[in-house]
């Protein structure tokens, strides 16, 4: 399985028991969707390795307590500590309307109602308080806030995000 064909689910955060159980931090708004997984991909030495789940249940708000097959003690759990966890993209529920997954709009054109098409989305910066579209217009990199009421339409068919941005925001980059 290639990383490009997967989505980031979370990270193995800490050991839970001396029998190899671990807590996986789930980077999701709906952790209950992932309570009954049969397997996940764990990134070990830059390779996605399938890990089969013997048992799992939610632990507190954002953690999944997991017992993997063939991880039977603390030493084996240590070997996968802090590793990232992935699932195949096909496991994501389809979104419609103006709801979208960040990875889904990478490569889409971005258009403002007044200015027209002004670039292509190359990345999403979600390390800030407000996620940002990272847009490339020729050599110019632009940061456009991903605010719901700015988004007019996610046009999946034409691979375009249409926005109604505050006057001057796009122009300050051009």
UniProtKB/Swiss-Prot annotation:
Fill in the subunit field for this protein: Binds ribosomal protein uS19.
Provide the GO biological process annotations: ribosomal small subunit biogenesis; rRNA processing
Say if the entry is tagged with keyword Chaperone. Answer: yes
Would the keyword NAD turn up in this protein's UniProt record? no
Q: Where are the transmembrane segments?
A: none
Q: Which domain of life is it from?
A: Bacteria
User: Which InterPro entries does the record cross-reference, listed alphabetically?
Assistant: PRC_barrel-like_sf (IPR011033), PRC_RimM (IPR056792), RimM (IPR011961), RimM_N (IPR002676), RimM_N_sf (IPR036976), Transl_B-barrel_sf (IPR009000)
- One Pfam family from the UniProt entry? RimM
Tell me the ranges covered by the PRC barrel domain, including all copies.
Answer: 97-169
- Which lineage do the record's taxonomy fields give for this organism? Bacteria, Pseudomonadati, Bacteroidota, Flavobacteriia, Flavobacteriales
Q: Which organism is the protein's source? A: Flavobacterium psychrophilum (strain ATCC 49511 / DSM 21280 / CIP 103535 / JIP02/86)
Q: Which UniProt keywords apply?
A: Chaperone, Cytoplasm, Ribosome biogenesis, rRNA processing
Q: Which Gene3D superfamilies match?
A: PRC-barrel domain, RimM
The free-text domain note is: The PRC barrel domain binds ribosomal protein uS19.
Q: What does this protein do?
A: An accessory protein needed during the final step in the assembly of 30S ribosomal subunit, possibly for assembly of the head region. Essential for efficient processing of 16S rRNA. May be needed both before and after RbfA during the maturation of 16S rRNA. It has affinity for free ribosomal 30S subunits but not for 70S ribosomes.
One CC-aspect GO term = ribosome
* Listed name of the protein: Ribosome maturation factor RimM
Molecular function terms, GO-annotated: ribosome binding
Gene that produces this protein? rimM
UniProt similarity note: Belongs to the RimM family.
**Compartment(s) of residence:** Cytoplasm
